């Protein structure tokens, strides 16, 4: 029975390089000299921590990061941007999570989308992915097209296509 997996995975190496390039640019830019501006990646937690002297500076760092990620070929929709919080004195911090794997709510949304369109395929939620199975390859390709058209806020990809 033909099947494919709908996944949400990012290339952490490219994200790490983009964060390192962001930190390098922060160090060389004149408007960040003598400030607490920094960017670092915690690979275990898949978090990017931005530190700055104020909300405006955090936004500037975020713009640099988005630019570097785009140049590296990483979709910025992988970023789950957190709130800006004060960490003492005039400094502020923002934690941005790097999405990896489809969350349960999003997987249920994909599953309901497929069931709601009464397609001849079944969607099963597995750890961090949604497996779609069907009798015909054409049905699976129609399901892929439907998912791409309806779900715009996630950079989903399809892999493990079996015939």
From Swiss-Prot:
A single Gene Ontology CC term: cytosol
Its job: Nucleotide-binding protein.
UniProt record similarity statement: Belongs to the YajQ family.
Top-rank taxon, per record: Bacteria
GO MF: nucleotide binding
Keywords of this entry: Nucleotide-binding
InterPro entries reported for this sequence: DUF520, UPF0234_N, YajQ-like_sf
Protein name as it appears in the record: Nucleotide-binding protein Pnap_1080
């Amino acid at each position: 029975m033909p099947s494919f997996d709908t996944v949400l995975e990012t290339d952490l190496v490219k994200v790490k390089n983009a964060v390192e390039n962001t930190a390098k640019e922060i160090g060389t830019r004149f408007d960040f000299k003598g400030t607490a501006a920094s960017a670092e990646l915690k690979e275990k937690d898949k978090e990017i921590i931005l530190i700055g002297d104020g909300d405006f500076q955090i936004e500037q760092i975020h713009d640099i990061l988005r630019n570097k990620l785009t140049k590296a070929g990483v979709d910025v929709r992988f970023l789950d941007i957190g709130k800006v919080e004060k960490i003492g004195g005039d400094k502020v911090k923002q934690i941005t999570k790097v999405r990896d794997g489809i969350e349960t709510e999003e997987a249920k949304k994909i599953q309901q989308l497929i069931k709601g369109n009464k397609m001849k395929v079944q969607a099963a939620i597995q750890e961090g992915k949604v497996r779609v199975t069907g009798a015909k390859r054409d049905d699976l390709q129609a399901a892929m097209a439907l998912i791409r058209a309806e779900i715009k806020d996630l950079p989903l990809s399809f892999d493990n296509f079996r015939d």
